[in-house]
């Protein structure tokens, strides 16, 4: 199993099935060699290498998504941090929901305090990716974290006697995904969040409605950054 591959068993560049400089000088040959390797064998090739070389190898693999998602989350996170978030968008777009959760757990918290600005930066970054797994992450477990995320960015009301107070929305951008829920953005950069909500409405409207109801009714967590 891939999760039983340990660093002490991993090859260095000299143990790759081709000279490391072929990644730049003979990329077609590297592609051909990688195409003959299983996902697990490719994972063994990638693990423990220099992050830039890791990214270059992934970009040459026909099974790049499978290999990326088979890597330990901390390995992919280290690659993204070392190469740079803006320069590793292709790798980020291939990360699995579980890997994204690991990134968010590390990046969105300072001690026990949630950092909304950090979260917004990652949501904005993922919006630049091609078909990222952000939507699948929203459909995964840890419902409360999604609620906390949305509470940091939104005020939500409905036009009924229980939830129609509409307090503190003066001057805030208004949006409704379905004509039922009135959403007011507490942040200036709302494009990415709006897009995510629309995608979620299209993918699974029940999940979106449950999240918006929770934003209305859940107490705001004391760990939210003021």
PLM regions: where:
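General marker for long, soluble alpha-helical cores
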Residues: 1-94, 98-226
């Amino acid at each position: 199993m891939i999760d039983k591959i340990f660093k002490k068993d991993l090859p260095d560049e000299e143990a790759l099935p081709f000279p490391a400089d072929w990644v730049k000088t003979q990329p077609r040959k590297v592609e051909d060699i990688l195409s003959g390797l299983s996902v697990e064998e490719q994972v063994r090739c990638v693990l423990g290498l220099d992050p830039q070389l890791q990214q270059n190898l992934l970009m040459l693999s026909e099974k790049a998504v499978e290999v990326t998602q088979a890597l330990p989350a901390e390995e992919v996170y280290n690659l993204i941090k070392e190469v740079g978030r803006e320069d590793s968008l292709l790798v980020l777009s291939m990360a699995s929901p579980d890997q994204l959760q690991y990134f968010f757990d590390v990046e969105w918290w300072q001690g026990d305090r949630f950092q909304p600005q950090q979260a917004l930066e990652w949501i904005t970054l993922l919006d630049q990716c091609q078909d990222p797994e952000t939507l699948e992450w929203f459909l995964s477990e840890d419902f409360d974290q999604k609620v906390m995320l949305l509470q940091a960015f939104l005020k939500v009301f409905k036009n009924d006697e229980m939830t129609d107070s509409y307090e503190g929305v003066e001057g805030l951008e208004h949006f409704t995904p379905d004509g039922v829920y009135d959403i007011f953005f507490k942040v200036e950069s709302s494009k990415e969040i709006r897009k995510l909500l629309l995608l979620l409405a299209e993918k699974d409207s029940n999940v979106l409605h449950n999240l918006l109801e929770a934003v209305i009714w859940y107490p705001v967590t004391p760990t939210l950054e003021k």
